[in-house]
């Protein structure tokens, strides 16, 4: 049970945070009404406002794992990494795109050491084969819905071409990396609402403190029969005398309700016991997932010096984090994992000295890699739970009702 002291401290922190938010909102509203600041500024501040008020799994006293988190407990705790979303919610359209930028410069000219692993291949992602073959990432990573992969691929390719043009470089072959989940239960996916304009907005919105929940590529996803979305988490590990960060971002769209585990608790079974009869309610029509199908895209970023082979070993442990939340990887589920490190860049031929025929890498010894394994598993588990805790309830295209994990936990109060 959570102690009275802990609950009191958490309450005091929440009150102080609310007071700070109140002062900020008054100033922000005044400036907006007076027309002092531009549209881009308002959009940025509104995003910050939403981030400040979003609930995450730790706000309910649930602390997954035992390794300390990064400053924000997000993938962007890895220096240089940024995330941007564009969300489209209009009528039957409930979808979006999310971009993960590995660093501030042109990745095509100075690729990142990378790895890709497919646990169960029910999916339509692009760009994985070249990552597996060469061990490098040369573009930002984009996430969207299944039927928009091609359109988003084209937009990412155009983004890289413009970067190369500005850098005075020629790009004749590009490997855009695009992952996907099928959001057709909530989104009219056949309308293919995401194009170049939405991808540009996601790039323009990229920052270090991204929103979670039903935003961007997570706008229309379902996880364990509840509303899913985008979630992120990070862990800090020590190798030698130096600390390194491992961050994870997920697009969650998988799992059967009955299987949901929250920090070791069989919450899914309890949800069905408490709310299961709502499925027959002609008004509420609460939806639950009976099978483990759908997908989860998992992106891991780190500044840990590793080879692409070591990185493959690390991202395979993301599957352990998925299993900790209860899933067993069903036939119709696609688990795709992509990882990159900012530590070992692989400059293209044009940026290398002509006489430089050998490449020197720094890599951790294998006997220290267990720390990274555990960090990856913990961050994945928490990222999934954050994707659900930050998402609100919604209705599907057939009128069915998808509950929010946050609402369920709020009704229970403290669960530990």
Language-model region placement:
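Short, positively charged and aromatic/hydrophobic N-terminal segments
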Residues: 19, 27-44, 48
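Intrinsic, low-complexity polybasic segments
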Residues: 7-10, 35
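Alpha/propeptide regions of enzymes that mature by internal proteolysis
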Residues: 52-416
């Amino acid at each position: 049970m959570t102690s009275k002291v802990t609950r009191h401290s958490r309450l005091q922190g929440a009150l102080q945070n609310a007071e700070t938010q109140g002062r900020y909102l008054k100033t922000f509203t005044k400036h907006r009404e007076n027309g002092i600041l531009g549209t881009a500024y308002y959009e940025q501040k509104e995003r910050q406002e939403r981030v400040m008020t979003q609930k995450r799994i730790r706000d309910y006293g649930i602390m997954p794992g035992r390794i300390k988190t990064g400053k924000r407990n997000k993938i962007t705790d890895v220096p240089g990494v940024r995330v941007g979303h564009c969300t489209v919610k209009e009528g039957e359209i409930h979808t979006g795109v999310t971009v993960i930028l590995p660093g501030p410069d042109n990745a095509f000219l100075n690729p990142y050491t990378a790895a890709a692993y497919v646990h169960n291949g029910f999916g339509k992602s692009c760009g994985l084969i070249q990552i597996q073959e060469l061990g490098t990432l040369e573009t930002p990573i984009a996430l969207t819905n299944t039927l928009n992969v091609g359109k988003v691929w084209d937009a990412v390719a155009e983004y890289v071409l413009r970067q190369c043009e500005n850098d005075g470089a020629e790009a004749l072959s590009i490997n855009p990396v695009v992952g996907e989940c099928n959001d057709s239960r909530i989104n009219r996916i056949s309308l293919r609402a995401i194009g170049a304009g939405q991808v540009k907005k996601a790039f323009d919105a990229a920052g270090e403190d991204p929103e979670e929940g039903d935003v961007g590529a997570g706008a229309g996803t379902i996880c364990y029969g509840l509303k899913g979305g985008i979630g992120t988490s990070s862990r800090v590990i020590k190798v030698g005398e130096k600390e390194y960060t491992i961050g994870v971002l997920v697009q969650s769209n998988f799992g059967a309700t009955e299987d949901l585990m929250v920090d070791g608790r069989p919450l899914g079974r309890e949800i069905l016991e408490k709310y299961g009869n709502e499925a027959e309610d002609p008004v509420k029509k609460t939806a639950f997932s009976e099978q483990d199908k759908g997908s989860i895209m998992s992106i891991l970023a780190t500044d840990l010096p590793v080879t692409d082979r070591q990185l493959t070993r690390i991202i395979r442990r993301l599957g352990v984090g998925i299993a900790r939340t209860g899933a067993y990887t069903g036939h119709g589920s696609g688990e795709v994992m992509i990882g990159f490190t900012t530590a070992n860049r692989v400059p293209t031929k044009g940026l290398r000295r002509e006489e430089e025929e050998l490449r020197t890498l720094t890599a951790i010894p294998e006997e220290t890699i267990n720390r990274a394994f555990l960090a990856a598993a913990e961050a994945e588990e928490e990222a999934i739970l954050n994707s659900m805790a930050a998402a609100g309830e919604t209705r599907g295209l057939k009128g069915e009702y998808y509950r929010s994990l946050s609402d369920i936990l709020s009704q229970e109060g403290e669960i530990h």
